[in-house]
Amino acid sequence: MKVAVLGAAGGIGQALALLLKTQLPSGSELSLYDIAPVTPGVAVDLSHIPTAVKIKGYSGEDAKPALAGADIVLISAGVARKPGMDRSDLFNVNAGIVRNLVEQIAITCPKACIGIITNPVNTTVAIAAEVLKKAGVYDKNKLFGVTTLDIIRSNTFVAELKGKQPQDINVPVIGGHSGVTILPLLSQVSGISFSEQEVADLTKRIQNAGTEVVEAKAGGGSATLSMGQAAARFGLSLVRALQGENGVVECAYVESDGKHARFFAQPILLGKDGVAERKDIGTLSAFEQNALSSMLDTLKQDIELGETFIK
């Protein structure tokens, strides 16, 4: 199993690479790529950690040597949010970066599963899909927007509020991966009930959690460490599913049946070929139904922005 991390010298990429080096199954290969010249050194640094994961770093304009033979590619390359920016302000820079990297994936490892971390995810996933489609290699079951950070935040915040163990909480989060498009389905958390005020407050906190980190870091960065952990969780789940483990379910932003929007975050069953099943989002509360209806225009606009960027 070979996993490639693109953008591996950045804050998310380094955290993700560290977690993968320590947690990938023995015998796995980890390939690190970034435009920054430090990247081979990041790989050397990580290579001293005593786990049976082979690691190599690549830098420069050409990602193809890093991508050769990859089963999974995780893309965290791009610029990070600064105070006062929202995820869509990142579009102008990050759209081109994602396009360039996915064009190289289409040539080098077209059958790989691709996890997009680079924001704005609502839009960058649509860009990736259109690039792959243009190259004639698009498989909607192998392209994912990594929204796992919304899930781990939801689990953490619910556990804090209710005095529970976070590992015992599982909040499904649907929709997209920015602002109002992030919709935690708190009504589906088993064994816990919330007041209307708690639901409103938690939903808002989960939607704005990225901004909470950006502001707390006072211009020194965005959510890199928690995002690294979230991306590692998703990547490791994908590894387990590709290796034949049954019953691996994660929420992710994938091309859906189009009922809500072309791309939609929902619980998915992972399998040997990527998405095995898009699971039903279940019954929503009135609050959730209303939030879903009112976010769809925003989500569809985000998607269209990505589609037109390529077309």
UniProtKB/Swiss-Prot annotation:
- Whether Calcium counts among this entry's keywords is no
- CDD domains assigned: MDH_glyoxysomal_mitochondrial
Which reaction is catalysed here?
(S)-malate + NAD(+) = oxaloacetate + NADH + H(+)
Q: Name one GO cellular component term.
A: cytoplasm
Catalytic machinery residues: H177
Q: What is its EC number?
A: 1.1.1.37
PROSITE patterns noted in UniProt: MDH
Q: Quaternary form?
A: Homodimer.
Q: Which family does it belong to?
A: Belongs to the LDH/MDH superfamily. MDH type 1 family.
Q: Fetch the PANTHER family from UniProt.
A: MALATE AND LACTATE DEHYDROGENASE, MALATE DEHYDROGENASE, MITOCHONDRIAL
According to UniProt, the name of this protein is Malate dehydrogenase
